[in-house]
């Protein structure tokens, strides 16, 4: 089984970096169901994990994350990044968890590929 880690840094809206990382993650799962895929959000991307955001038009990051978590893709938010933004205690999208750099390091060491957005 191939192991891929996607690390995303961009804000959920205003930049398409996170959007494109999620598009790729969903496409990878559609192409290969026997894939160990993991998603780690850092920097401004951690705000994507907050429940109840209502974008005006276009894509919906919460829906994209829910698609991935429904497929048992682990989605973690950098604890240092959430602490720095004061959002660590706010409600998260179901299936999204706070993670640590140690976890990301472990994921990276066991991965076949690490993709960064």
UniProtKB/Swiss-Prot annotation:
Q: Which Gene3D superfamilies match?
A: DsrEFH-like
Q: Which Gene Ontology cellular component annotation is one that this UniProt entry carries?
A: cytosol
Domain of life, source organism:
Bacteria
GO MF terms, alphabetically ordered: identical protein binding
* Assembly notes: Homohexamer. The hexamer is formed by a dimer of trimers.
Q: What's this protein's family per the entry? A: To M.jannaschii MJ0989.
Protein name from the UniProt record: Protein YchN
Organism (species): Escherichia coli (strain K12)
State which gene encodes it: ychN
């Amino acid at each position: 089984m191939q192991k891929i880690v996607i690390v995303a840094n961009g804000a959920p809206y205003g930049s398409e970096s996170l959007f494109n990382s999620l598009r790729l993650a969903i496409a990878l799962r559609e192409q290969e169901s026997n894939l160990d895929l993991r998603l780690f959000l850092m920097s401004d991307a951690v705000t994507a994990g907050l429940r109840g955001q209502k974008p005006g038009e276009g894509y919906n990051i919460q829906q994209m994350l829910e698609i991935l978590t429904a497929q048992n893709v682990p989605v973690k938010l950098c604890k240092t990044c959430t602490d720095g933004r004061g959002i660590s205690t706010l409600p998260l999208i179901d299936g999204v968890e706070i993670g640590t750099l140690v976890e990301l390091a472990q994921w990276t060491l066991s991965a076949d590929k690490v993709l960064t957005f």
